[in-house]
UniProtKB/Swiss-Prot annotation:
WD repeat feature ranges: 13-52, 55-94, 97-136, 140-180, 183-224, 227-266, 269-309, 351-393, 461-501
Name this polypeptide is given: Coatomer subunit beta'-2
Keyword Nucleotide-binding part of the UniProt annotation: no
SUBUNIT field: Oligomeric complex that consists of at least the alpha, beta, beta', gamma, delta, epsilon and zeta subunits.
Principal localisation: cytoplasm
Length: 910
């Protein structure tokens, strides 16, 4: 059966002809050598060019990263080797290396050595610690030396491929080859070593259109790979997968199974001839260099093939090798921090006859199934003995140890615990995936169908695109994960049982009430598992979360891609593994999970009994869970964080509790928030206290002015002046009728023009004094403008009704500060909207008229016109209303509807 490996294109960049490619070991970079003479670095994550080096005008046939030095080394047709620092782009070294075209450069993995091969038929060894001195020359080939590569298992040896139709293996320090492999009928273009530990192989590609796999210990050809229609120009063994890649001038890259040598896939991206292949150990990415650009592909998923049983024993596969570790070997004395790599001793368990693509313990942990290459093998977990095998594209366990295999899209077989076939199902649709658990599930790209294990009867069809399925141990809850979200459903097994036992018919949709949707959460799951009624998962944003009752809590932020292994209740820790098989653990208290589960079930008595066993530092997390369930009172009782308790108290309207927290915290923001809440609920005494604590002068101004509290306004005036809040102080003075203080405040604030305009409207007698100050101040900036200012003492003709305004001011000044009762507002509001000067001039001043009240309302004081002559030179007497009330701030001249805060332009001249 073929390997089921997804191949995804990760980068496609068009360029000049690419002669070699290399991958950086730590950065997301591809190094491409171009026939045009340039070397480019591409970032395959951002799909952009990072750097470009103009090396020469002739082709650059090979370049490599030297990551430990931050260098790149390049060999070109001008016979020079050049070394660049890829960070600074400085040229580190340039030297003539050969007498003909340089075909290849290879970097030693640990030593300061670089090998170069050339059309001069020589191989040279260069030592950069010795100033790039040539320390050795290897002679023996009789034609161009096309490629050299170090043996990763024995870095003291290397192989060379030549157009003399041979491959030679050399040792550093010896001028003669160790041996020669001769088998191709035409020149050999490329060579690569097998990186795995079990086979001493190398592969060669030739102009005879074949690739050959050699055993360099027996010096024999193991396999010849035929199928290309042109010269084979690039070959490699994939470092992580059981595949061999060959690239040809026919424009294709062929993928061969490394064990069976079966052709698995053929890739053709339409970029003409293939010249180079690049890979990196530990990665599934492969780079291909073409005539017209560079392609990067990713083969398969980088998910570690591993499984953990309920006791903490982990089994994983590295290639065909099976290894095991046991978390219990870490004693209680070793305190491992959350997220820290566990120091586990790896034990070799055995090997597998097929390449594992999935590995899973059965529910009781006795058996482990390995599935891959279209087959499955069931092993014993302890001794790794083969118990059963067969054909399968997929394998799943039931909760009681039975299992099912998907042989094809149209056939699923169910087996008993004794490994005997019990039932065969032919679904009426194309089954692309199957899932195990309480029910056997089969799905297409559009829907999933659940079947019972006993008879294979359909239980329910759900229309959703399923990527994974997770059953809770209780069998009552199941998570369906899709591309963008996941759904938590309740399985009503009693409803299903009664329906089936009663002989009820099952339609195309199954039993209608079999499942009940509880929650939908818009997160993409990477891996997940159930612990009780708690669903633990890590998402695409590298967060480790858990979900209880639809409430999602983030446990930790992961620093890399991790995959869940399982949860050990006796340690209260959840374990994860990365693709390098590093195991880490994170604490997740079982008591916390149990508490939340009991709350969701409505068992509050047992939940409260469990609460003391939860550490105090976790109580806020418990409170947030209760808040999410609408249980604010209970959350307030449990919460410990003062900020959080304050927020809860405010939500509940528990002002006394919030006040106690605010007193303890002495937080200005808390006092302000509490003051606003108290004001909105009518608790004005508390509001005043809170606003005073918060020093919220604007809030106090609103409160005192609304209450008509003159004493409060007086107190607020002092506070505002002390804090430099002149706007608040001005309004307080104005409402109190202290117009002289208003003017003085404007003058002190250097707002002299505004002071002049205000005095013209409210205190005409102060105008000459302020105009003098204004002239003096303006003289410093614009003397001409200062001279243009008119003083009413000198030019009374420029100020309309000036004398009347002075007389009215003198009459009403002693009456300021006397306030009418609030109950008379309606009477005052109905008075004519007319200034005193206008009233005098129109001779319609009546006793009932009143002046504006102390707080600046648009009402008028009563003025009587008894005995007033028409002459403006005569004294004007303005009487007050019978109740003695006057306005605190009298608009003597001008329209009161045009009052401004500190300014009024009515009838003032300059």
């Amino acid at each position: 059966m073929p390997l089921r490996l997804d191949i995804k294109r990760k980068l496609a960049q068009r360029s000049e002809r690419v002669k070699s490619v290399d991958l950086h070991p730590t950065e997301p970079w591809i190094l491409s050598s171009l026939y045009s003479g340039s070397v480019c670095i591409w970032n395959y994550q951002t799909q952009t060019m990072v750097k470009s080096f103009e090396v020469t005008e002739l082709p650059v046939r090979s370049s490599k990263f030297i990551a430990r030095k931050q260098w790149i080394v390049a060999g070109a047709d001008d016979m020079f080797i050049r070394v660049y620092n890829y960070n600074t782009m400085d040229k580190v070294k340039v030297f003539e290396a050969h007498t003909d075209y340089i075909r290849c450069v290879a970097v030693h993995p640990t030593q300061p050595f670089v090998l170069s091969s050339s059309d001069d038929m020589l191989i040279k060894l260069w030592d950069w610690d010795k100033g790039w001195m040539c320390t050795q020359i290897f002679e023996g080939h009789s034609h161009y030396v096309m490629q050299v590569t170090f043996n990763p298992k024995d870095t003291n040896t290397f192989a060379s491929a030549s157009l003399d139709r041979t491959v030679k293996v050399w040792s550093l320090g010896s001028p003669d080859p160790n041996f020669t492999l001769d088998g191709h009928s035409k020149g050999v273009n490329c060579v690569d070593y097998f990186t795995g530990g079990d086979r001493p192989y190398l592969i060669t590609g030739s102009d005879d259109q074949t690739a050959k796999v050699w055993d360099y210990q027996t010096k024999s050809c193991v396999q010849t790979l035929e199928g290309h229609a042109h010269n084979v120009s690039a070959v490699c063994f994939h470092p992580e997968l059981p595949i061999t890649l060959t690239g040809s001038e026919d424009g294709t890259v062929r993928l061969w199974h490394s064990t069976t040598y079966r052709l698995e896939n053929t890739l053709n991206y339409g970029l003409e001839r293939v010249w180079a292949l690049g890979y990196m150990k530990g990665s599934r990415r492969v780079v291909i260099g073409y005539d017209e650009g560079t392609i990067m592909i990713k083969i398969g998923r980088e998910v570690p093939v591993a499984s953990m049983d309920s006791s903490g024993k982990i089994i994983w596969s590295k290639h065909n090798e099976i290894q095991t570790v046991n978390i219990k070997t870490i004693g209680a004395d070793n305190e491992i921090a959350d997220g820290e790599r566990l120091p586990l001793a790896v034990k070799e368990l055995g090997t597998c006859d097929l390449y594992p693509q999935s590995l899973r313990h059965n529910p009781n942990g006795r058996f482990v199934v390995v599935c891959g290459d279209g087959e499955y093998i069931i092993y014993t977990a302890l001794a790794w003995r083969n118990r059963s095998f067969g054909s399968a594209l997929e394998f799943v366990w039931s909760v009681d140890g039975e299992y099912a295999v998907r042989e094809s899209t149209s056939r699923i077989k169910i087996y008993s615990k004794n490994f005997q076939e019990r039932k065969s199902i032919r679904p009426p649709f194309s089954a692309e995936r199957i899932f195990g658990g309480v029910l056997l599930a089969m799905c297409t790209n559009d829907f999933i169908c659940f079947h019972d294990w006993a008879e294979g009867r359909m239980i329910r069809r759900i229309d959703v695109n399923v990527k994974n399925l997770y059953w809770a141990d209780s069998g009552d809850l199941v998570t369906i994960a899709s591309d963008t979200s996941f759904y938590i459903l309740k399985y009503n097994r009693d409803v299903v049982s009664s329906h089936l036992d009663g002989g009820g018919s099952v339609g195309e949709e199954g039993v209608e009430d079999a499942f009940e949707l509880l929650h939908e959460i818009n997160e993409r799951i990477r891996t997940g598992l159930w612990v009780g009624d708690c669903f633990i998962y890590n998402n695409s944003s590298s967060r480790l979360n858990y979900c209880v009752g639809g409430e999602v809590t983030t446990l930790f932020h992961l620093d890399r891609q991790m995959y869940l292994l399982g949860y050990l209740a006796n340690q209260s820790r959840v374990y994860l593994i990365d693709k390098q098989f590093n195991v880490v653990g994170y604490t997740l208290l079982l008591t916390m999970i149990e508490y939340k589960t009991l709350v969701m079930r409505g068992d509050f008595d047992r939940a409260n009994a469990l609460l003391p066993s939860i550490p105090k530092e976790q109580h806020d997390s418990v409170a947030r869970f209760l808040e999410s369930q609408g249980m604010l009172e209970e959350a307030l009782e449990i919460a410990t964080d003062s900020n959080y308790r304050f927020d809860l108290a405010v939500q509940l309207g528990r002002l006394e509790v919030a006040k106690a927290i605010a007193i303890e915290a002495q937080s200005e923001s808390k006092w302000r928030q509490l003051g606003e809440l108290a004001m909105s609920t009518g608790k004005l005494d508390m509001a005043e206290e809170c606003l005073l604590h918060a020093m919220d002068l604007s809030g106090l101004l609103l409160l005192y002015s609304s209450l008509g509290d003159a004493e409060g306004l007086t107190k607020l005036t002092s506070m505002a002046k002390e804090q430099g809040k002149n706007n608040v102080a001005f309004l307080c003075f104005f409402m109190l009728g202290k117009l002289e203080e208003c003017l003085q405040l404007l003058i002190e604030s250097n707002r002299i023009p505004e002071a002049a305009l205000m005095s013209r409207s409210y205190l005409p007698s102060k105008v000459p004094e302020i105009v003098t100050l204004w002239k003096k101040d303006l003289q410093k900036v614009n003397p001409k403008a200062a001279e243009s200012l008119a003083d009413p003492d000198e030019y009374p003709n420029l100020f309309e009704d000036w004398q009347i305004a002075l007389n009215v001011e003198a009459n009403v000044a002693p009456k300021r500060g006397i306030y009418p009762p609030a109950e008379e507002y309606i009477i005052h509001a109905e008075r004519p909207n007319e200034t005193l000067v206008e009233a005098f001039k129109s001779m319609h001043i009546h006793l009932e008229e009143v002046l504006p009240d102390e707080n600046g309302d648009d009402t008028h004081e009563a003025i009587e016109e008894n005995g007033v002559e028409e002459s403006q030179e005569d004294a004007v007497e303005v009487d007050v209303e019978a109740d003695g009330s006057t306005d605190g701030a009298v608009l003597v001249n001008g329209n009161d509807t045009e009052e401004q805060w500190g300014t009024n332009n009515e009838e003032s001249s300059a």
